[in-house]
Structures are given as C-alpha cells and as structure tokens.
UniProtKB/Swiss-Prot annotation:
Keywords: Cytoplasm, Endonuclease, Hydrolase, Magnesium, Metal-binding, Nuclease. This is Ribonuclease HIII. Belongs to the RNase HII family. RnhC subfamily. InterPro entries: RNase_HII/HIII, RNase_HII/HIII_dom, RNase_HIII, RNase_HIII_N, RNaseH-like_sf, RNaseH_sf, TBP_dom_sf. Endonuclease that specifically degrades the RNA of RNA-DNA hybrids. GO terms for biological process: DNA replication, removal of RNA primer; mismatch repair. The gene is rnhC. A divalent metal cation binds at residues 94-95, 199. CDD domains: RNase_HII_bacteria_HIII_like, RNAse_HIII_N. Its EC number is 3.1.26.4. It is found in: Cytoplasm. It comes from the Bacteria. Manganese or magnesium. Binds 1 divalent metal ion per monomer in the absence of substrate. May bind a second metal ion after substrate binding. It comes from Staphylococcus epidermidis (strain ATCC 35984 / DSM 28319 / BCRC 17069 / CCUG 31568 / BM 3577 / RP62A).
Length: 308
C-alpha cells in the first residue's frame, strides 16, 4: 500500500474538501476529516497534513491536488536540470477555474519568442500572480493582439457532462492543454520552437495517459511546478486563461443580477443557495461544477432554513 503525504494551507484543504464528501465527526484526536475516494483513503489532520493511502495513492493525489508536491518526495518535476526558458522560444500552457465552484475551466497555450521577452517584462507579465482581476483584463487584452495563442473554454454544461461520464478534472485539463498546444503549433514556424512547457498539474505519465492524443513534441515538452515564475510563456498563458475566466464570471453575474464569487468558500455556499432560491437547482448547475461539495452545502443551507 502506497502512502503520499502533503502539507496544505487552510485554503487548499478547503478546496480539496469541496471535491468529494468527507467525514468530519467521530474522528480520532488530531484528525480533521477523512474519506475514501477511488479506493484510496484520504486523512486530513489538524496540523494541515494530508495523507493518501492505497495502491493508487499517487494518481489520486495528482487528480485532487494537481499543483502540490508531496513531502514524501515522490512528486517531483520531470526536469532534472533548471532550464532558463526565457532564453528560448517556448509554448507555455496554463489554466484557470479548476478550483472555483462557479464558472468554466479555461486553458490557454501561448507562444513566446525571445523577441517578446523585453516587452512582456515591460508590461509586467513576470509578476502575473500579483495582478488583480482588473489588471489581468487590461493586460490580457494587450497580449492577445500580438501573442500567438489558443484559448479553450469548457463551460459548465460540458464540464458536468464529462464529469458524469467519469472524466476527472485532470483528464479534462490534459485534453484541453494538449489541444491548445497543438493549435498554437499550427500558428508558428516549428523550427522556431525550442520548448513546450506546461504548468504542472499532473506527472508526465498521468498527463500522457489522459490527454487522448500524443504529445506533439515529447522531447521538447517539460512540466514545471509554479511554472509562471520560471517561464514568461506560462505566465502569459496564465494571464490569458485567467482573463477568460474573469470575463465569463462577469457575464454570469450580470445574467443572474447578483455578484457571483470565485473560489469554493463558505461565501460561495451562501450564493449558491441564493441562486437555487431565486431560480432553481437546474439554473445553478448550468453555472457551476456539480461535483464540488458546495452544491450539497447550498442545499443543506436551504433545508436548514425551511426546517426551523
């Protein structure tokens, strides 16, 4: 039986618990929650550590915690040396919306040549994780005018259809990343491509298993954790994918005449309950990811209100 251990923040634990049902009562001292998911036991401890136990522990951990590396040292980047990607012509890919109950899953692949590096730094792309949504929108609307890219959006209806067919979020992301990358390759001179660098959400073998099609250039393809800090191509893709997610969320808010929050917090539960009350559960399902625990929590809030 394999064991994989992670150290998570409170926000990361909240996001993990939103993805499946956990037991939170009658637990041993020091344990916060536990569940069994795909024949893997998941224990969440008060210390912030999370343990996955089972034959497929690593694979399940990669699905539910795609952006984390384990403290057991088993989840490492596929790259053994540090590559200075900004000295090369690269396609980078990243996604947005995977941890948000409301809104779609958006994926972008973007091509950044060496000639783009100076202007991207001047625009502030290298600080992409520090940008608020307003700045993301302003910056992305400039980037899409001169950066070869492919932006794919999996709306909630299609997302929920695939999830009901047994697709994990990792599979959805692998398929979308691979398609976006292939789309960009068609837009550039292939001899002007040194690397394809993917913001790592799963190990290479897991990605290849789920992608449905082969990696376009396996020898040039790298997977990097915290990739936006290592590659301006990933940072650019991150901004454009986030831009698409933000614009879609704005559209949902206007359509429903209420502010729809990002994330998967308790505030999200309250707004989901309001959507059900104002419209119905079917409307909620068209703008959200059904398998997140927020849906059940919203229904519980409504039941509590009417059973008082």
């Amino acid at each position: 039986m394999g064991n994989v251990v992670y150290k998570l923040t409170s926000k990361e634990i909240q996001s993990l618990m939103a993805q499946t049902t956990f037991e939170t009562t009658k637990l041993p001292q020091g344990m916060k929650a536990r569940t069994r998911y795909q024949n893997t036991v998941i224990n969440i401890y008060s210390s912030g550590k999370v343990m996955f136990q089972g034959k497929n522990a690593e694979q399940v951990a990669s699905q539910l915690l795609p952006d984390k590396q384990s403290t057991t040292g088993k989840h490492t980047s596929s790259n053994t040396t540090s590559i200075q990607y900004n000295h090369f012509h690269c396609i980078g890919s990243d996604e947005a919306g995977s941890g948000d109950y409301f809104g779609p899953l958006t994926v972008c692949a973007a091509y950044v040549s060496q000639s783009h590096i100076k202007i991207l730094k001047e625009l502030g792309v290298d600080d992409s994780k520090k940008l608020n949504d307003t700045k993301i929108v302003d910056l992305a609307e400039q980037l899409i005018t001169f950066i070869p890219h492919s932006l794919l959006t999996l709306d909630n209806v299609k997302y929920n259809e695939r999830q009901s067919l047994g697709w994990s979020q990792v599979k959805m992301k692998a398929v979308l990343h691979n398609e976006a990358i292939k789309n960009v390759i068609q837009k550039i001179e292939q001899d002007q491509l040194d690397y394809i660098v993917i913001d790592q959400f799963a190990k290479r073998e897991v990605y290849q298993h789920y992608a449905l099609s082969a990696l376009p250039f396996p020898d040039k393809t790298k997977f990097e954790t915290k990739g936006e800090s290592k590659s301006l191509a990933i940072a650019t893709a991150s901004i454009i994918s986030r831009y698409a997610f933000v614009k879609h969320m704005d559209h949902i808010s206007k359509k429903l005449h209420m502010e729809i929050p990002k994330g998967a917090s308790n505030k999200v539960d309250l707004i989901a309950a309001k959507v059900i009350q104002k419209y119905d559960i079917q409307q909620l399902d068209t703008i959200s990811k059904k398998h997140f625990k927020n849906r059940d929590k919203a229904i519980h809030l409504i039941n509590q209100k009417y059973n008082k």
